[in-house]
Amino acid sequence: MFSKLTEAQKQFFETGRTRDLAFRICQLQLLADAMRKNETVLEEALKKDLGKSAFESYATEIGFVLADIRYTIQNLQKWSAPKRVRTPLYLFPGKSKIQKEPYGSVLILGPYNYPVQLLAEPLIGAIAAGNCAVLKPSELTPHVSKAMYQIVHSTFKEEYIACVEGGAVSYTHLTLPTIR
């Protein structure tokens, strides 16, 4: 199963769609919309798993993620632009720049203490950078894990962003090969 998933993500990444700035911004907006739409579901899951109140859930998890998505969307064009750097004299008349490139596919393992925030924050970075991602929520927060699974699967295609559930045994099989 995991080899098929990683192969599908590799093929999707190689199409080059994830490198497009407009695509990345659109995907971040889709994530924000899904988080807003499922805010109550996430609050209930956090209450069941960790005993968090609705206020605490929003302040430390959901609202935090939504604010970071907004900030990322506002700054992504600037962050993605090539950065000019000094060219050594012996390379004159050449010009040098740093061009940021996506890695390919990212594995994000979620902890139990802030299960939404610490799963979604790296996902925001992965999407912004132009990567595909596999999310593995903590098995110690089963309600949040189920909610995140549903959010991811209803929002993204599996060959782009996937979410897998299960215990420690499942993530030992989730080693991702380097796409490049």
Where does each model-flagged region fall?
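Rossmann-like NAD(P) dinucleotide-binding subdomain of oxidoreductase/dehydrogenase enzymes
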Residues: L89-L174, R180
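N-terminal Rossmann-like NAD(P)+-binding subdomain of aldehyde/semialdehyde dehydrogenases
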Residues: M1-K97
